[in-house]
Amino acid sequence: MLAALLGGAGARTGTLPGALLCLMALLQLLCSAPRGSGLAHGRRLICWQALLQCQGEPDCSYAYSQYAEACAPVLAQRGGADAPGPAGAFPASAASSPRWRCPSHCISALIQLNHTRRGPALEDCDCAQDEHCRSTKRAIEPCLPRTSSVGPGAGAGSVMGCTEARRRCDRDSRCNLALSRYLAYCGKLFNGLRCTDECRAVIEDMLAVPKAALLNDCVCDGLERPICESVKENMARLCFGPDASNGPGSSGSDGGLDDYYDEEYDDEQRAGAAGGEQPLDDDDGLARPGGGAAAAGGRGDLPHGPGRRSSSSGSGGHWANRSAWTPFACLLLLLLLLLGSHL
């Protein structure tokens, strides 16, 4: 076939440029991967092509190696980390478990990989006929940092990412108001402390708002995915789970922690009122006289400058005794002068 393509030995010189042009055209078709071909669908790359392009970019190659290292324990469970695409992935059985979640450091590595130039193509690449690649993408799907509807061809019944759900809520006045009330009344829920009656009522009101209900059913994604998952877990456990009515402070005011800090502050005030610590003078750094009386609720005279002391302190009495000797010294001096004049 090659001899026929080249036109025989006697005509090689004249037909060689034409053969090269045919080969170059074939390579161009293979590399461009037009729509409908076996190498790509639209602008999506085959996963092995996306991986080669990532390896050719220093930032993407480094992020890919960091991803493989961060997700190594999960990849080892699957036993196939050599798959093309966004690295050999997570066990499908574990990913489908409701109690399983991606490690936070692995999610962070995925986010960093997505921030490179060639990284997003690894997520959106086409596996073609590679079944191993398809199983890898299915397994890693719950860990991808999506910011829109989950899945490339998400339909009306698909699950939405929480980032997109938050955008839609911000554009809706009713949902935005409900979200503001949720942030105001559910502070202890975010910290995993309690779900108050007020917070539970706000959540129930939110579920009646169509756009706000999307926030309850969405899948955590994006940069805030670990925080989102923690809040959802706390809400399911403290507001509607077995711990909803058990444990301290599961209902009532949302200021329980504030009450604790107020009580601690009152104890410090009572300790200071006992005169255990003397206030410092503003000028020389010495203990201010009368400070204990002032802390205990008395008047407590303050000094009017450096070196001055109140008459209520011991040092004040010392200064009063020295001033009392001044008239006696004058009398003695006068007597000595009189005696000297008579002599």
UniProtKB/Swiss-Prot annotation:
GO terms in the biological process aspect are: apoptotic process; axon guidance; camera-type eye development; cell fate commitment; cell population proliferation; cerebellum morphogenesis; developmental growth; dorsal/ventral neural tube patterning
Q: Which residues are glycosylated?
A: 114, 321
Compositional bias per record (Low complexity), positions renumbered to this chain: 303-313
Q: Which cysteines are joined by disulfide bonds?
A: none
Stretch forming the signal peptide: 1-38
Q: What are the UniProt keywords, alphabetically?
A: Cell cycle, Cell membrane, Glycoprotein, GPI-anchor, Growth arrest, Lipoprotein, Membrane, Signal
Question: GPI-anchor amidated serine lipidation sites on this chain?
Answer: 315
Q: Which Pfam families match?
A: GDNF
Task: Give the residue ranges for region: Disordered.
Answer: 268-317
Q: Which residues form the propeptide?
A: 316-343
Composition-biased stretches, type Gly residues, lie in 288-300
Membrane topology annotation: Lipid-anchor; GPI-anchor
Q: Does Disulfide bond count among this protein's keywords?
A: no
Q: Where in the cell is it found?
A: Cell membrane
GO terms for MF: oxysterol binding
Q: What does the function comment of this entry state?
A: Specific growth arrest protein involved in growth suppression. Blocks entry to S phase. Prevents cycling of normal and transformed cells. Binds 20(S)-hydroxycholesterol (20(S)-OHC).
Q: Could you identify this protein by its name?
A: Growth arrest-specific protein 1
Lineage, please? Eukaryota, Metazoa, Chordata, Craniata, Vertebrata
In the UniProt record, what gene is named as encoding this protein? Gas1
